[in-house]
UniProtKB/Swiss-Prot annotation:
Protein name per UniProt: cAMP-regulated phosphoprotein 19
GO cellular component: cytoplasm
Modified residues (Phosphoserine): S62, S104
Biased composition (Basic and acidic residues): 12-32
Taxon lineage: Eukaryota, Metazoa, Chordata, Craniata, Vertebrata
MF terms (GO), sorted A to Z: phosphatase inhibitor activity; potassium channel regulator activity; protein phosphatase 2A binding; protein phosphatase inhibitor activity; protein phosphatase regulator activity; signaling receptor binding
Transmembrane is among the record's keywords: no
PANTHER family (UniProt xref): CAMP-REGULATED PHOSPHOPROTEIN 19, ENDOSULFINE
Compositional bias ranges of the Low complexity kind: 1-11
Positions bearing N-acetylserine: S2
Subunit structure: Interacts (when phosphorylated at Ser-62) with PPP2R2D.
Alphabetic keyword roster: Acetylation, Cell cycle, Cell division, Cytoplasm, Mitosis, Phosphoprotein, Protein phosphatase inhibitor
Family, as annotated: Belongs to the endosulfine family.
Gene, per the UniProt record: ARPP19
Amino acid sequence: MSAESPEPASAEEQKEMEDKVISPEKAEEAKLKARYPHLGQKPGGSDFLRKRLQKGQKYFDSGDYNMAKAKMKNKQLPTAAPDKTEVTGDHIPTPQDLPQRKPSLVASKLAG
């Protein structure tokens, strides 16, 4: 019963084996990096683009501009106190509670 069992490979040996076995994705990535070396650089763009990005975007389109303008206008306007303090829905109106209708100036075609 003294069969030799394979020893587990050390971490260094496993790392070397992984480096030798290249996945198809890694091979394709290496091929593309060789073909397009400038794409591997960090995105930065031109100085103009960098300055615009630092400033921050004010408005995307005229709709954003108008919404921001309306929001600023709403903040500046004072809120008016409501004239009516009456709360609707407290009671069920009856014919006696309702105000009288004003007579119409135009005669109805239905009244004959």
